Structure formats: structure tokens, C-alpha cells
Amino acid sequence: MGKEEEKESGRNKMNCFGSVRSIFMHADGVDWLLMGLGLIGAVGDGFTTPLVLLITSKLMNNIGGSSFNTDTFMQSISKNSVALLYVACGSWVVCFLEGYCWTRTGERQTARMREKYLRAVLRQDVGYFDLHVTSTSDVITSVSSDSFVIQDVLSEKLPNFLMSASTFVGSYIVGFILLWRLAIVGLPFIVLLVIPGLMYGRALISISRKIREEYNEAGFVAEQAISSVRTVYAFSGERKTISKFSTALQGSVKLGIKQGLAKGITIGSNGITFAMWGFMSWYGSRMVMYHGAQGGTVFAVAAAIAIGGVSLGGGLSNLKYFFEAASVGERIMEVINRVPKIDSDNPDGHKLEKIRGEVEFKNVKFVYPSRLETSIFDDFCLRVPSGKTVALVGGSGSGKSTVISLLQRFYDPLAGEILIDGVSIDKLQVKWLRSQMGLVSQEPALFATTIKENILFGKEDASMDDVVEAAKASNAHNFISQLPNGYETQVGERGVQMSGGQKQRIAIARAIIKSPTILLLDEATSALDSESERVVQEALENASIGRTTILIAHRLSTIRNADVISVVKNGHIVETGSHDELMENIDGQYSTLVHLQQIEKQDINVSVKIGPISDPSKDIRNSSRVSTLSRSSSANSVTGPSTIKNLSEDNKPQLPSFKRLLAMNLPEWKQALYGCISATLFGAIQPAYAYSLGSMVSVYFLTSHDEIKEKTRIYALSFVGLAVLSFLINISQHYNFAYMGEYLTKRIRERMLSKVLTFEVGWFDRDENSSGAICSRLAKDANVVRSLVGDRMALVVQTVSAVTIAFTMGLVIAWRLALVMIAVQPVIIVCFYTRRVLLKSMSKKAIKAQDESSKLAAEAVSNVRTITAFSSQERIMKMLEKAQESPRRESIRQSWFAGFGLAMSQSLTSCTWALDFWYGGRLIQDGYITAKALFETFMILVSTGRVIADAGSMTTDLAKGSDAVGSVFAVLDRYTSIDPEDPDGYETERITGQVEFLDVDFSYPTRPDVIIFKNFSIKIEEGKSTAIVGPSGSGKSTIIGLIERFYDPLKGIVKIDGRDIRSYHLRSLRRHIALVSQEPTLFAGTIRENIIYGGVSDKIDEAEIIEAAKAANAHDFITSLTEGYDTYCGDRGVQLSGGQKQRIAIARAVLKNPSVLLLDEATSALDSQSERVVQDALERVMVGRTSVVIAHRLSTIQNCDAIAVLDKGKLVERGTHSSLLSKGPTGIYFSLVSLQTTSG
């Protein structure tokens, strides 16, 4: 058993060293050179103090043991003072190297680490992201706060450690040279100083990992809510999110307090230094009495041992950060070193010289890695001939999209093989394989860059002409050309500034520009309106010519021209043939599906005679390009005069108030009081110790042995007393400040998230407020503020206490010398303060750069399937490199200032010592002070200088802390233009649901020059269903955004029940409105939790959940899953098919029992059979409710009480289905129906 424990211990040591190495794994040749020079600088800086002590011993011996009236007295003093000035010059050089080199290499290595980490994450196979449900928040944390931890260690904490270690070594060398007997006696005290530090470091590794794991859970809650803020707002889920976030934070609070206690015990243990002085004073007196040692030499050796010990203790206090960085670095290296099973970077594998595109699935067996109990394919076979179009149809969740995922090698099958041109795809080079395919997914993933850049994701080296041609082929060129910035228009995070149809057309252009051999279309036209769909369908059919095409569609009218149609059911192909062949089998699966869809269109086919519709359709085609459905906002967004002021203030946060920060800590006032008292007492210990030390030195120069023994006993006991006090006070101080800091951090995070979730949707649409950037601020800023209030506040109180007491004592003992020594203190303070100001101005840009990196990382991970499909990893890495260019330049400047600041402050300290001794010698010679007064005053005020220097060492933390506090209050103080909790708002228990738009003007804040509505009016009757139809980008979804009050109109009024929507208490109003969006947003929880999210009450019965699921036609598929309602949905519902997600979203809305139901393409993702049943369910749910239905598929809205037709942001027609058709070919609705009938 003992041997096993020994082996385990050995393994832990190896792991520890391995994790420490991980901090430096990102260094290149230049970094090693910088670290080498920085090492010389840090070691040189450390050796400066022992050298100063060596010279000081000579000065003290001159002062204490010489006759003050001789001519040689001042000569000796002057000579040794000049020697101190030489040391100061050398100190300047080494300190500059230390400051410059470490700051520079810290930024270089962390920038490279971010790049390697993101590259490694994007290299992982899709299965990795399925299994790591918090991967998005993990990546944000690693790219922002984790890289910040490593940069802090490399730039500041590591050089501090090296400097402290070299001070320790240098001190012992000087001690042995001057008085080896005393040095040997002091040697055992090292053990007493080292053990607490090592124990603390070991405990900290465990605690810091646990804290990180605890916060990751909270960060994931926040990231989900912010990235899906429209869903959170629509379902009034803010309080649920805050409650879940708060619960997740509680664990990290307890661990943080535990960490503070461990730190208090460790630093308190350094009080052993005082006890050591007690022993060394006694033993030193014996050296003086019996071995002829001089007092100055005894002091220098004892001081060297004490300073060496204190330095080692100070170095060990940096272990906290060092081990934390090692823990972070190890976790990051695990990801970087992870080689995925399906490796897109692996150059091995065949590249076919000429690819025909014949695809074959042979006896494939497959389950998703995250749902091993649910079999998707078992002995699945499919053959796609070269150059042919094969359409896959079947129920939602039958495995159609899995075919595309397996063909692209997102996953590998468990058994069987997949062949292209007779070659198994696992033998082909992964990147080459994917380059032969063009993918258009059901939910198009766009990146927060320009339209042009998004299309170029398909082909890196394409020309502008290629981009335009691809856009024309996907029917996107016209609407892009109408935008003010054309192809340079920013699409926003996840493409939020584009309508669904516009996003889909950009995604199709991205696939077409690739000129792929194999075209994969997964519901490629599901988001398009009728007119766009027809043209894009033609474009896709043209693109399919000569290419192998696999087409998945619920709308069977889009696939009737396919060469082969295969019906998938329960993971098997149950029918195969052409449309005509399959229709011959009346009882077949395919003919049944077609029959279901034809029933929906019977009325249309009877009513419409397809005739002279070319002109109207042409008009529609032109009109659909004019308006752009922007859903976003940017830094110069405008929602009215008050908002202009509001947004400009966003960018200018007021100077942070420390008083306000303390006010937030008011509930912990007892801990604050105890902590401050403890810090004040610990501050007083330093001057008391210095006074005892100065007095003790003067004792060594006494001639009476009895007097030496008596006074030595008194001072030795006082040192022991100080040691005990120091231990107890430190424990109290660090525990209380950790308690304060942790609860403040929790409170700040809760209040920030709570405040953020009151901001208008336009704020989230701005580039700088992406979910990644906000989560990064939640993680990082609160941590920095905690450090400011905890560790830094304690240090400030200590410093004030020590300085006040020391200055008073110095002035009482020897006022002339004290005044000179106090007068030069500001010089050192100014150096540190200047360094702080320079670093503060530059740290802002560093933080901004990390936000940019976080935003990019979050977006990349969210769209990892698209990146994988298009092998766009390199393009993302170039975007990251571009985002870091500006901060790289700033870092170089920052390094120079860091070097100069440290060099000046450290070298001036030695200069002041030279001045103190020279001037003190003059005062002694002139008879103004005694040697005892000089030693006491010098010790007291020099120790104060050290305290100020220690306080100065936190200038970097203060700079970062000040920015973080400013960032926190900028969020907390921001005025919300659409306040969901307006106390004056009208709260209503129920609404009838009459909606009216009166002379509404509206443009999305990001593009105020593109008018969506101008004098727009519409009345939606209570309890009736109103369908909104029209071309893509005509303003249909904008109506829903205004009813939900995501935005306010620029002019005019939106009324509900005859009352201006702005007069309502917004959250109470939203309780009566339910939204089902085109792209359903689910949260990472169980199906049950996602449905309950729609509940207004906190207590929802199981029967209500099942009833809602049945109404949405979801109950059957949910109960067929192994875990049933407890099935985990995955991040954003990735574990479920599009149709399954949509049905859960509908169930969530049904559970709300709303007065107003908003359906934005609610059935677009469903297959025909599900659509019919859900459509019936929705129609039942719509009875007696005000329903606003947006649909491209006109067959789904013909039973609505009223149909409103929009074009170019205007209401051009209104009536029932039959009354609008009766207008004939001149009517726009007639034309839209005719287009769908033609394509059907």
C-alpha cells in the first residue's frame, strides 16, 4: 500500500512539473532570448539588495565604531556612499532588462497561445463539441481570462519570483562572506519559511481548478442567455436565468473564502522572520562579545538572512499565481495536444486525380457519440450515381441530415463503409475530401464580418467577379446591391442583420463559389419566400447539372425533378425511385407524403388559373431586393434623440468610484471592519519591528557586556511577540478580505448580468456587445475588482498605517534626518505612479483586444460545423491575427515604459540610501544626532520605503482594476431605453390582444438610412388570426420585433388593447405574448426544462408539459427517446433535428397560454406529415387568440381570418385568402400564390 502511495506521489510531482512547463510551451526563439535577458535582469535586480547590505555594513561600522571627530570619518562615509551610487547605476540596467523583456515576452507568448488554442479547438471533430456541452463558454474563458492569467504570470509574477529567489541566494552569499558562523546558524530558518509556501501552492492547484469548474457552469448559463437574448426576453426568462446563474456562483464563493484562509496562514507563517530576528539578535550579541565581530557586520548578516527569508516568502506568495497559470496552461495544452480521430490537419490520405462524385453507403451502422443508446442507422445502404441528384425525404429525425454529416466525415460510422468513386472516405485526405463538397444547411451560419467575406469562406482565393457571379446564381446580388455598403455590409453576429431568406441566399452563394463536385443541400430553400425560392431553386438546379447532388427537403415540390428519390424511415431506405415511379405505388410512403401536401394546396390549385402573371412577378422580384431586414444595431445606432446621447455615453464610462464599490460591499461591513483593523495592526507591526531593529544595532556598539545582554533580551522577546501577532493578524486579515471580495464578485456578476438583461435588443446587436465579449467581461472584470477590493485594499490600509506611524516616529527621534528621508520618498512614489498611469492607458487597448479575440472565438465555436465543412480554419486564424495587430504594437510601447519605470524606481532607492547615510554622517559629525538615533530613524523610514515600494508593485493591478471597475459601472449605470421593469409601467393581468400600428416609421438602429417602415399602419383584430406575407426583406419579421418591443419605432405608435405599448410594464406584457421563431432557440438542458421555460408560473404540472407537447406533435417523438422528457438537448439543441427543435419550441409557446401568439415561420423546419399535424395543432391553439403568422409557405395561412400583404415596408393588400385571390393577376397575393403553385 505504501509503495502505491509513493508511486502516486511521484506521478503527481511529474504532473506538477508538466503543468509548469505548459506555461512556456508557446515560446519561440525570440521569446527564449527575451526570457534569457529578463532572467539576467531579474537575477541582477535580486543581487542588488545583498550588495547594498554589504556596503551598508561598512557604513554602519564607520558610524558606530569610529571617532566622529577624525578627518577619515566623512571620507569613509563618502567613499561608501559613492559605492552605493555605482550599485544604483547597475541596478538601472538590470531592472530595465527585467521590466522590458518579461512584459514583451508575456504578450508575445499569450498571443501565440490564443492562436494555437483556437486553432486546436477548430481542429477537433464535431463529436468533441457534442460531448463537451460547455465548449463555447470554455473557449471564451480560455481566450480571455485564462490567457490573461498566463500573461500576468509571465510579465510580472515570474520575474518577481526570480528576483526574490536571487535576493535569497545573494543574501546568503553575502552572509557567509561576512560572518559564516552567524549565517550557518540562520540557515535552518529557510525550512520554516519554505514549508508553508509549498503547502499553500499545492492546496491552491486543487482550489483554483475547482473554482474554475464552478465558474464555468455559471459562465455557460450567462453565455446561453445572452446569445439567445430574444428568446429570454420573449419568455420573460430573465429571473430564471439570474436565479440559475446565482446558484451556480455559490460554489466558487465558498472555495474563494477557503483560498483566502490558506493565503492568510501562509503569509502569517512568514512572521517566523520576526522570531528569527529574536534568535539572531541574541546569537549576534554573543558574536560581538566573544568573537570580536562588529555591530554593522552582525546587522548586515542578520539582515541578509532575514531579507533573504522574506524574499523567499514573497517569492512563494507568487506561487498562487504561478500554480493557477500552470493549471490553466495544462488544461489549454490538453486541448492543443489533442489529436482528433478525424483530423482535418492530417496531410495523410489519398487525393483522387479525377473525381466523378459517385457516393455509396454500405451497411452503415451509426449512433451519435452523445446519444449512444439511440441507434440512427443499422445496416444503412444508399447509392448516389455520379452527376445525379438524389433526394432524401422522410419524417423529422429519420436520419436524413445524418447522411450529410457522415459523408462530410463530421463523424465516422461504427460499422460499414462510405465510398466515393469506390474509395472508402476514411482513406482520403480529410481536407481534400471536404473541398470537393459544397454544403448549404437548414439553419445558415454566417460570421460577423462582411457579406463578401462570408461568401469567400467558400473559396479563399476567389476574385470579386467570382463573388458577384455566385451571388447572382443564388439570387442574392440584387438585394446586396441595394444595401448602402453593398458587399461590404456587415451581417452582424450570427448574421442577425439579415433576414432568414437573405442569410440563406448568402449561404448558397458561399457553396456555389466553391464549384464543388458534390453538392449537399440540407433544406437549402426552406427559409425563402415563394418568389425567391423559385429563382434560387432554378439556380440550384443549374448548379446541380453535372454534379452529384444530395438534396434533403420537407417540401416535396422542390425535389420532384430529382433523378432518384429515396425515402428514409427509422434509419433505413424504404423506397427508391423517380417521382413518377414512386407515385405509381399508391400505398407507398412517398405517395402518401405527396398526397398530404397536395391536400394543403387543393384550394389554391382550384382557385388559381396560371396565366398572365409575368409582370406582377417581375415587380415582386424587383421589390424584394429593395428592403433589407436588418435585426441589429451598432455603435452609431439611433432609436431617437435620447438614444444618441445614451450610446455616446456608453463609450465614455465615468471615472470609477471606490466609494461606490465599497457601498456594494455594505452587507459584509463586519468583515470589512475586522479586515481593516487587522490590516492597520499589521501595518503598525512594520515600524515597531524597524524601531526594534535600529535599537538592536546600536546595542552592538555598547562596551558593557551586561548592558548588551540586558537590552538584547528585551529586543529578542519583542521580536517573538511581533511574530505571534503577525501570524494571527494575517489570518484574520486575509479571511475577512477574501469573504468581502468573493461576495462582492458574486454580487457584481449577478448585478451585471441582471442589468445586461434589461438592455434593449439593439444594444446586443452592436459588434462590441457580442455574447463572447459580455461573458468575458463577466468573468474577468469581476475577478479583477475582487483583487482590488481584497488584496489591494488590504495593502493600501497596511501602507497608510505603516507610513503614518513611521513618519511620526522618525520625526520624533531625529527630525532633521527624517525630513530629508521623507522628502525623497515622493521621487520613488512618482516613478511608480508614472508607471501606473502609462500602463493604465495601455491596458485598455489590451482588454479591448482580448474582447475581440473572445468574440471571434465564441463565434467560431458556435459555427464549428460550417467552419469544418468549408475547411475555413485558416480564414478564422487570419481574422484572429488581424484582431491582434493593434494590441501587438501597443504591447511593444508598454514594454519600454515598463522597463524604464522599474529601472528608475529601483535605482532611485539605492540613491536615497546613499544620501541618507551621507547626510546622517554629517549630522552626527556636527553633533545634531547620535548613532542610535540614525540607526532607528534609518530603519523606520527605510522600512516605510519598502512598504511604499510594495504598494508600488501593485500599480499594474491598480491600472487593470481601475479599468475593470470603470467597465463594471459603465454597465450598471447605463440607461436602458426600453426598460422592462419600468415602475410606472401599466401592469395587466390579461389582455384581449388587439394590436394596432399607427403611422409607424422604423429603421433598424444599425442602418438608419434604410427605412423599413414609413407611415406604416395596420390593425390586427383581437382573437383573430392575421397572416403577414410578402417578399423576403419586406418587413414581416419587423412587425413581430415591434410587438415584442425588442425595438421602438422612430415615429408613430404601436398599440395593444388601445394603449401605447410603451406605457406597459414590459415584462408583464410579454407574459401574455408567445413567440415561435424561424430558427428555434433551445437551451442546454433537458426537453422538460426547455418546455417549462415557457411557463408563467413557477409550478408546472407534468400533465401540463405533456399536454403542451401533444399539442405541438412532440410527445410521440419525445417518448420514443430513451430518456424521454429528460433527454439532454445539447448546446442550442444540437442533439435534436430541426423539426424536433421546432416542435419543442412550439410546445414551450403553447404552455405559456398566451393572449397573443406570434409565429415566425413556425412550421418551416417540419416535414410534411409533422407540418400538417402541427398546423392543425397551431390552428386549434390560435382559436380565441390574437395570432400573427408569418409564412413563406402560403398553404399554411389560407385559413387565417385575415391576410396582410407587405411590399417595400408598406401594406399593399389585405383580406381573406379567397377575397385576395378574387383580385386576379393584378393582385400581389395572387401572384405569390401562383408562383408557389407553379413551383409545386
Curated annotation (Swiss-Prot):
Where is region (Disordered) located? Answer: 617-646
The name this protein carries in UniProt is: ABC transporter B family member 15
Q: Which domain of life is it from?
A: Eukaryota
Domain ABC transporter residue range list: 359-595, 995-1233
List of residues binding ATP 2 = 1030-1037
Give Gene Ontology CC terms. Answer: membrane
* Statement: the UniProt record of this protein carries the keyword Glycoprotein: yes
